[in-house]
């Protein structure tokens, strides 16, 4: 009842995590003409608490698209220029994932991937067996610690409790609260 505009998205309506988002009554905005579904956070840590933690590298395709398509302005850098920084960030925040060798999704410095469940593993094997055109099923690359710890930052391995949207008490997923804020105090 206090978030009528944000609840249109279906994202902020769960009791477990709606406290992360702005009260539309106390903090209104006018969207009558275009019905913009603006999800607005109201918490220390900003969007780093609610971003979903999907972490993909841009590829050479992304950096060269404007030049090849002849539209807009060409990027002044290429993937190879920032690849070392992707490595640094992935190691700092702890990105889990499966190296797949896909040029459109460059591999990185991943922690061990979350295990696929039985159905996902069966689908992965079936796709591999029945299609030889490069199709795959892979898990998402997300900023979750799946092995080891970052104890100085108060972060430990994911406990697989499916409570991510409530805010991880273990610091297993990356957020500014579990990492950057703590490190700034050290």
Predicted segments with their positions:
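Glycine-rich FAD pyrophosphate-binding loop
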Residues: 1
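Conserved redox-cofactor binding core of oxidoreductases
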Residues: 5-22, 27-37, 42-43, 52-57, ...
């Amino acid at each position: 009842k206090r978030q009528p505009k944000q609840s249109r998205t279906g994202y902020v309506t769960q009791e477990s995590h709606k406290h992360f988002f702005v009260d539309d009554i106390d903090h209104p905005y006018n969207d009558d003409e275009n019905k913009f579904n603006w999800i607005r956070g109201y918490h220390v840590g900003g969007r780093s608490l609610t971003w979903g933690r999907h972490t993909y590298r841009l590829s050479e395709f992304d950096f060269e698209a404007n030049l090849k398509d002849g539209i807009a302005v060409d990027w002044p850098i290429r993937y190879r220029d920032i690849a070392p920084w992707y490595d640094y960030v992935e190691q700092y925040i702890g990105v889990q994932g499966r190296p797949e060798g896909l040029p459109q999704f460059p591999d990185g410095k991943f922690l061990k991937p979350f295990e696929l469940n039985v159905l996902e593993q069966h689908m992965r094997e079936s796709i591999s067996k029945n299609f030889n055109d490069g199709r795959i099923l892979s898990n998402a690359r997300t900023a979750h610690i799946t092995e080891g710890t970052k104890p100085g930052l108060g972060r430990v391995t994911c406990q697989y409790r499916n409570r991510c949207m409530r805010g991880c008490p273990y610091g297993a997923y990356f957020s500014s609260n579990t990492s950057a804020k703590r490190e700034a105090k050290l």
